[in-house]
Amino acid sequence: MHRSSYCREETTLCQGVNSTWVPPADTVPEASLTPHSPPAPDSPAPSPKPGYGYSACEEKPGDPRIRRPMNAFMVWAKDERKRLAQQNPDLHNAVLSKMLGQSWKNLTSAEKRPFVEEAERLRVQHLQDHPNYKYRPRRKKQAKKLKRMDPSHHLRNEGYTGGQPMVNLSHFRELHPLGGSGELESYGLPTPEMSPLDVLEPSEPAFFPPHMREDPDPGLFRTYQHEMDFSQEKTLREISLPYSTSPSHMGSFLRTPTPSAFYYKPHGGSSARTPLGQLSPPPEAPALDAMDHLNHAELWGDFDLNEFDQYLNMSRTQGPGYSFPMSKLGGPRTIPCEENSLISALSDASTAMYYTPCITG
């Protein structure tokens, strides 16, 4: 009776602790009494799990990594680093390395000799232990770092999702020659030194009014590279007038916009076009409307038509005239060279006036 109550009490205590049924002591095998029994020798060893000193990229057991033999500085710094770290526990490892390098440079050859001999002994021993050793540096992390620092790598990773390939920027650095083949042949380089005439068609003149473009022979016009600076009153007194003295022709001539960046030169009736040079910026439109109220008699009073015809005949007998700016016609007529220049300029202006009725009419 007493024994059965003791067994019932022991069973209840065991159930309260482990909540599992415990068999009687005489039926439990002897091996199960030990709390931590070692595994049987037949069972395989448990495989190491990642995160406990092992990784998936661990080197193969048959090919362990062999460390390089230490040189003289490493042999000396092995103990010296420990001593400096104990003396300066707050210093960073990089600062310690700088201090060690400076201290090693300050050593004499006699002080370095024992460490050099020890490094040579370690090298010979390493060569005997690993005759097939080959140094293979680990540069994968450095290569990734350089790749991250590459600006083209950032451009590719900017999240460009437009569906179109990115434009190659290398062709903007290449300078194509003007005379070569390609799209830049007819347009020229996009530089400030480019002339405005480079982007025009060969058949279309530059800065000509619409009525001048209808002229059957635009080769009579030639560019003048310097803008002529003279007043409007002086222009009216120096430019020769057409032979027709009717006021209607005079008014139409005044209203015709004459660009000051051009002067006229005949080419003997040939239809060949003169190549256009570099063009100056177009001048401001002259205020010709302010002269409509002037009397036509005052405008015609300073011109002698007979003298003008005499100069015209002389210029035709002497040959083709030289082009001369109109702003230089105000000098004295006593010098022969200036008189010849004046005759040539008047001849050019009269030839231009022959085409005035066709242009304005």
UniProtKB/Swiss-Prot annotation:
Specify residue ranges for compositional bias: Basic residues.
Answer: 133-147
UniProtKB keywords = Developmental protein, DNA-binding, Nucleus, Transcription, Transcription regulation
**Keyword Metal-binding, does the record have it?**
no
| Residue ranges of the annotated DNA-binding region, renumbered to this chain | 66-134
What are the GO MF terms of this UniProt record? DNA-binding transcription activator activity, RNA polymerase II-specific; RNA polymerase II cis-regulatory region sequence-specific DNA binding; sequence-specific DNA binding
Tissues expressed in: Expressed in the adult spleen, lung, heart and kidney, and at a lower level in the adult testis, liver and brain.
The residues covered by the Sox C-terminal domain are: 234-360
Residue ranges, annotated region (Important for transcriptional activation): 147-208
Q: Please classify the protein's predominant subcellular localization into one broad category.
A: nucleus
- Compositionally skewed regions (Pro residues) per UniProt: 36-49
User: Which InterPro entries does the UniProt entry name for this protein?
Assistant: HMG_box_dom, HMG_box_dom_sf, Sox7/17/18_central, Sox_C, SRY-related_HMG-box_TF-like
Gene Ontology biological process terms, A to Z: angiogenesis; heart development; lymphangiogenesis; negative regulation of Wnt signaling pathway; positive regulation of transcription by RNA polymerase II; vasculogenesis
Q: Name one GO cellular component term.
A: nucleus
Q: Where is this region: Interaction with DNA?
A: 68-81, 92-104
Return the Basic and acidic residues bias intervals.
Answer: 148-157
Task: Tell where it localizes.
Answer: Nucleus
User: Position of motif 9aaTAD?
Assistant: 306-314
* Keyword Transcription regulation assigned: yes
Region feature Disordered, mapped onto this chain:
17-65, 127-163
Protein task: Transcription factor. Binds to the consensus DNA sequence 5'-AACAAT-3'. Also binds 5'-CACAAT-3' and 5'-AATAAT-3' but with a lower affinity. Acts partially redundantly with sox7 during cardiogenesis, acting indirectly through nodal-signaling to induce mesodermal, organizer and endodermal tissues, which then interact to initiate cardiogenesis. Also acts as an antagonist of beta-catenin signaling.
This protein's domain notes: Binds target DNA via the HMG box domain. The 9aaTAD motif is a transactivation domain present in a large number of yeast and animal transcription factors.
Query: Can you name this protein?
Result: Transcription factor Sox-18B
From the broadest rank down, the organism's phylogenetic lineage runs:
Eukaryota, Metazoa, Chordata, Craniata, Vertebrata
* Gene name of this polypeptide: sox18-b
